Curated annotation (Swiss-Prot):
Function: RNA replication. The central part of this protein possibly functions as an ATP-binding helicase.
This enzyme's EC code(s): 2.7.7.48, 3.6.4.13
GO molecular function: ATP binding; ATP hydrolysis activity; RNA helicase activity; RNA-directed RNA polymerase activity
Top-level taxonomy: Viruses, Riboviria, Orthornavirae, Kitrinoviricota, Alsuviricetes
Protein name in UniProt: RNA replication protein
Keywords tagged on the record: ATP-binding, Helicase, Hydrolase, Multifunctional enzyme, Nucleotide-binding, Nucleotidyltransferase, RNA-directed RNA polymerase, Transferase, Viral RNA replication
Family per similarity comment: Belongs to the potexviruses/carlaviruses RNA replication protein family.
Catalytic activity: RNA(n) + a ribonucleoside 5'-triphosphate = RNA(n+1) + diphosphate; ATP + H2O = ADP + phosphate + H(+)
Organism the protein comes from: Lily symptomless virus
Amino acid sequence: ARERMDEEELEAFYNCVRIIVKNKHLLKSDVRNVYEEQLD
């Protein structure tokens, strides 16, 4: 699939991945907080 993407799309894709990886711990704690609020 990588050959079909142009460089701009590839860059956008890697930026998305980088942001997700960087914010993974934040995502996990947000999800946990949402569930804890629902349980109260």
